[in-house]
Amino acid sequence: MTGNEHPIGVFDSGVGGLSVLREIRAVLPHENLLYVADSGHLPYGNKPAEYIEQRALTVGRFLLSRGAKAIVVACNTATAAAITVMRAEFRVPVIGMEPGLKPAVALSKSLVVGVLATEGTLKSAKFRDLVGRTTEKVEVIAQACPGWVEQVERGDLGSPATRDLVRRYTEPALERGADTLVLGCTHYPFLAGLIADVAGPDVHIVETGSAVARHLRRRLEADGLLTRRMAPGVELFWSSGPAEVAGRSLAVLWPGVHRVRPLPAGFAAGD
């Protein structure tokens, strides 16, 4: 197998990164994709940065062992904690996530932008640096959203409990004048409809999965790594948590999944 026929590896703390995988599949229909849900260590957002870094390196090594020609860190928290060390260790392109503050600032007329993200992302030096670089004239309201990741992991995208959680953590930024909301966690696009219901039609909602997918395509093209196959690509899925639990969530978020493989023990265990 030549280098450009190898698969692309994608991972997240759970199933949230499927929102990014969906965008990758849309722009790279012929590529084979590997996806790891690190559900045995979910959520990343409330864990120490050192722990997340070790998990990201471990999952990255697994993807490389499966022949990945590039790795997408489809998790804002893991990007903030681990992208630098991953790029230093791995000799393949490593693409990360960051909240879409730059497009949000361009869209905002009230000059108030809300960022909905995990505690780990909002407390990271990477996020503070991003705010400092892009929001000189804009007020940024950083709002952690505990419970959102867990609801998405359960495949619970519309129950009264989920609606209440979404309202609880969306309204504070709106009450302070935000006219643009940034979804700073890859789980949150699965709640975008509920967020829009709370925010109303005049509030912009910014997510970055499509931008990351386009960046990945450009990088693969520049490095000569795009597949030459014309057949549709396939997806393979692993989970470090109970595979049957991940399978139920995947059935809701990625219809057509037939199998979720357990991550091998050497990669699934904590560090």
UniProtKB/Swiss-Prot annotation:
Pathway annotation from the record: Cell wall biogenesis; peptidoglycan biosynthesis
Role summary: Provides the (R)-glutamate required for cell wall biosynthesis.
Disulfide-linked positions: none
Residues that, per the record, bind substrate: D12, S13, Y44, G45, N76, T77, T186, H187
Protein name stated in the entry: Glutamate racemase
PROSITE patterns the UniProt entry points to: ASP_GLU_RACEMASE_1 (PS00923), ASP_GLU_RACEMASE_2 (PS00924)
Similarity-based family: Belongs to the aspartate/glutamate racemases family.
A GO biological process held by the record: regulation of cell shape
Keywords for this protein: Cell shape, Cell wall biogenesis/degradation, Isomerase, Peptidoglycan synthesis
One Gene Ontology MF term: glutamate racemase activity
